[in-house]
């Protein structure tokens, strides 16, 4: 699921703006709520719905209003959001029954093998120039750090602690990702500041605060649900 989700996201990004991709991908918060509710035959609480709405709005608009026109790339990105939602739900299910470290290691190995196979089957894995680029100065180390730190250890922490959260809570927390990316981009001068950063980031932050502080008050057994 993780491999297919990231692959479809990259394919979609080839033909749409990053802001549109961010908005459509953020729909995984909504899909997580829908699928979880359908599976449990129970509607989310009002607090959860408010948190989902704020998180989806914030993640989608932190880079400004998306200029959305529906095409193949947009539908592929929506499919990516569904896959991310399923990944969150299946992670919740399996890590409550299996060792999270083993699950993380297996997932990382499977994704690595699938990604490597994709490079050679449909990419330019046979082009020596591409490999020379990867092993050139200033490229290899960031690639390794992103793979080990940005992927494996993030996946490990996700699997270790997500089992203690309701899937919708987890999805809303994950939606904070564009906030950190935007802050990092601002620090490096890669992103221009706009009022939408405050609006989108604020909506995400408020959505998380509302869910974390009020969901257990409204339903004390919430985090015990699967």
Where are these regions (language model features)?
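C-terminal transmembrane-helix exit sites in multi-pass transporters
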Residues: 9-11, 28-50, 179-199
């Amino acid at each position: 699921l993780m491999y297919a989700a990231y692959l479809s996201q990259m394919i979609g990004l080839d033909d749409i703006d990053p802001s549109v991709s961010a908005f459509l991908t953020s729909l995984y918060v909504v899909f997580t709520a829908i699928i979880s509710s359908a599976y449990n035959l129970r509607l989310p609480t009002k607090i959860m719905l408010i948190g989902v709405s704020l998180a989806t709005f914030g993640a989608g608009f932190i880079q400004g209003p998306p200029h959305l026109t529906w095409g193949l790339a947009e539908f592929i990105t929506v499919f990516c959001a569904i896959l991310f939602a399923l990944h969150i739900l299946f992670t919740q299910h399996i890590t409550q029954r299996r060792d999270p470290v083993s699950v993380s290691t297996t997932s990382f190995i499977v994704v690595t093998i699938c990604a490597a196979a994709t490079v050679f089957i449909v990419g330019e894995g046979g082009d020596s120039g591409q490999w020379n680029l990867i092993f050139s100065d200033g490229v290899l180390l960031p690639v390794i750090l992103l793979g080990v730190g940005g992927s494996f250890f993030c996946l490990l922490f996700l699997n270790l602690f997500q089992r203690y959260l309701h899937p919708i809570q987890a999805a809303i927390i994950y939606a904070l990702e564009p906030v950190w990316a935007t802050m990092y981009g601002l620090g490096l001068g890669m992103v221009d500041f706009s009022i939408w950063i405050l609006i989108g980031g604020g909506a995400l932050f408020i959505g998380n605060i509302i869910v974390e502080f009020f969901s257990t008050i409204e339903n004390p057994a919430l985090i015990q649900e699967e």
